[in-house]
Amino acid sequence: MTKRELYLFNPDNDLSLASGEVNYMPPATARRMAEELALLPAWYASAGSAVLAPSAYNLAFLREMQECLSLPVELVTEPEVASISNLKPVPWGWNPALKRRLRCLGMPETELPAEPYLEKLRHLSHRSQAVELLPRLQLDESFCGESFYLTQPEEWCRFVESRASCLLKAPLSGSGKGLNWCKGAYTAFIAGWCKRVAALQGGIIAEPVYNKVIDFAMEFFSDGVGKVVFVGYSIFSTNASGAYDGNLLLPDEEIERRLSAYVPKVSFVSL
């Protein structure tokens, strides 16, 4: 039987993956975002697939959008999951809590990731992986940056107090969460924060603070069996604390033009 993809948007994935708990409850803001943006996958889902929404209240908006744009997807509500036999879940991200949620909705175990897969995913999502990869991404003089994975209290203290300013990060976090901005003093608050994060996630990511001029990301797609392809750029904004504020919706050509004001196009294209 041909599987039908069921897309779902779970913006709490980073937080849930960091927790690792099957009963993890996201904060109210994340739950509200997931509910209000439940139909977001309709904009990137493959033709003929379905999008999971909390209830049929989302259907009116989807129908309105389909009158104006080509969005060849259908809505599936949570109560309907158990009655549709050929669904294959395609979430924003996998984590133990989502696996439990889908199982409770009636998704067959064969369509859910095994525990070793989730453990490997958590390991690969850990920022210590980026620390190891960063030096290999610096292809020419246009690139810079350093990042450290520190596991001992004396390392945290030494790093903070040896710089006028620096940034400490929880290894499993996203969207500007799990950040601690330091001003050269290893205070009791910072020490306590580091100890709590390291107890849960193994250590702390420590980085210098740079004179940033623009936030952008390169987006890639992995098919899960070894093939990775570049799918586009993302230019976004953050607030003074580093938390995500929003995105600019621009074609890749325009983003490349803007980035070229700071870095030669040949450099980031080669990356």
Language-model-derived ranges and their functions:
Residues 140-145, 167, 183-211, 270:
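Conserved ATP-binding module of the ATP-grasp superfamily
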Residues 134, 159-181, 200-212:
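ATP-grasp fold ATP-binding core
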Residues 30-39, 127-132, 187-193, 259-271:
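Well-ordered, non-membrane alpha-helical segments in soluble/globular domains
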Residues 146-147, 166-190, 217, 239-256:
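Glycine-rich phosphate-binding loop of ATP-grasp-fold ATP-dependent ligases
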Residues 1-43:
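N-terminal-proximal low-complexity accessory segments that begin disordered
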Residues 30-44, 51-158:
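Conserved N-proximal alpha/beta basic substrate-recognition cap immediately N-terminal to
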Residues 190-242:
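Phosphate-binding site of ATP-dependent enzymes
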Residues 220-271:
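ATP-dependent carboxylate/phosphate-activation module, predominantly the ATP-grasp catalytic core
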